[in-house]
A protein has these predicted regions:
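Eukaryote-biased, non-catalytic alpha-solenoid scaffold regions
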Residues: 1-276
Length: 276
């Protein structure tokens, strides 16, 4: 097919971007930075945008395998680049979009990618495979519950997916992983499930305690916030700065309840963290 030919030409470097680099002194001589301008003289952007449109048509027609093959290639693709004098670093899909060489809704593209991936994979492989995409910054900004509203067909086996997704994320470090874990548990198990996970997973994701307190704060449940704060501070590593944030929220809850002794106790924890 034409798409397959374009993919091969890009992979082999037969289709490439021209570049021109220069030193930008617009912020002053000492704050100059090297700027690379890309020139798409071979219409690569148009070809990739055609693939993106075709893949979405495949999703709408329930041809998920065909869509998935294109999406996988798009996110792994590297377009060669060369200046007049030498080869330059290759360019991925996100850099193409940042430099206006393609014009597409990257968030929707990412959600459709995950949707197609979900549809073609066996149930027990979905969470692990889909997580690999989150190395890309576009995916790192997604909210997974949006996945369930992007395609025409309702996704199946969602209970197993959420269980597998939560089991995978709870073992992973990182801010994105913590956010995804929090959102997944709140969506699937609610605030009590989030608190349960915080208790079990304090060493890997201590920020879950803070998320629980934030949720309780929305309902002005200050006694629960106090209790969470006490439990969190008894379990979280004493060197972590998040302890001061937890203690501060707990102190505020105590002040709302006129629990002066507890408020002073939590405030002392905040001061201790600052002075460490």
């Amino acid at each position: 097919t034409q798409i397959q030919k374009w993919k091969e030409l890009i992979d082999e470097g037969e289709l490439y971007l021209d570049t021109e680099g220069y030193e930008d002194y617009s912020n002053g001589y000492w704050d100059s930075e090297w700027v690379t301008e890309y020139y798409d003289n071979q219409g690569i952007g148009d070809k990739i945008q055609y693939m993106i449109r075709f893949a979405e048509d495949c999703v709408n027609d329930r041809r998920y395998q065909a869509a998935n093959e294109i999406y996988e290639w798009l996110w792994e693709m590297e377009v060669s680049a060369a200046s007049e004098y030498e080869e330059e670093d290759s360019v991925d899909l996100e850099i193409l979009e940042e430099n206006n060489l393609i014009h597409t809704d990257m968030k929707r593209l990412a959600l459709l990618t995950l949707y197609a991936d979900y549809q073609v994979l066996p149930a027990n492989e979905r969470a692990k495979d889909m997580y690999l995409y989150f190395a890309c910054s576009t995916f790192a900004k997604l909210h997974m519950e949006e996945l369930f509203h992007v395609g025409r067909e309702e996704l199946k086996d969602t209970e197993q997916f959420w269980e597998d997704w939560i089991d995978l994320l709870k073992e992973k470090n990182g801010d994105t992983e913590a956010r995804l874990l929090k959102e997944a548990i709140l969506y699937y198990k609610g605030i009590d499930g989030l608190y349960e996970m915080a208790e079990k997973n304090a060493s890997v994701h201590p920020s879950l305690y803070l998320s629980v307190m934030e949720q309780y704060e929305k309902g002005h449940l200050y006694e629960k916030i106090e209790k969470v704060g006490e439990n969190a501070l008894s379990k979280i590593d004493g060197n972590l700065t998040i302890r001061s944030k937890i203690a501060l929220r707990a102190a505020f809850a105590s002040s709302c309840l006129n629990h002066e002794e507890k408020m002073m106790h939590f405030a002392g924890r905040v001061l201790f963290q600052i002075l460490q």
